[in-house]
Amino acid sequence: MRPRLPTFVGLALLALLDVGVARAESAIYALDADHTYATFAIDHNGASVNRARFDEVAGSVRFDPVAKAGAVDLYVQVASVYSGSKGFDEHLLSPDLFDAARFPTLRFVSERLVFDGGRLVEVPGQLTLLGRTHPVTLKARQFRCYPNQRAKTEACGGDFEAVIDRTQWGMNYLVDKGMPRNVRITATIEAFRQ
């Protein structure tokens, strides 16, 4: 079994909201660990793209589809990073990058969801990484709620992404040697209505 990743976000988390199924009250959604993780990608010397994921994402999502309101509070365990390369994973966890010994979790918090008509488009929030907190807006690439037969309740999920400048959080490794500052983060989320 591979470790579980988000991202970043991540991330993200988020708006497990059903714009199609109207309910008058705010509901809590529990994350589905089998379908929730975060990934990141960064250019590697213009030759390839390094990718990895965090598989351990926990937290809560609250959503009111009628009011088009909600909140997200997600925690990512940094040690759950998985790139497919043991050596690269160890470097990602080192003080050069995520410094997992000092900063074992990432956190994304959002107090609002942005809709365009009935469609969820953004989840603006705050990302805490390496002990620093800065705003990040996750863009909804897809989002849907549906009746989940296995869980016997409504499930909502989607893919959300953002591009961040890692140096805002003090992750400066090799920037002075030409490595990019920008990192694409994606949060894949599914959650069950409680």
Segments and roles (model prediction):
Residues 1-5:
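N-terminal secretory signal peptides that target proteins for export/translocation
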Residues 23-194:
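Low-complexity, acidic/polar, glycine-enriched regions of mature
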Residues 7-18:
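Bacterial N-terminal signal peptides
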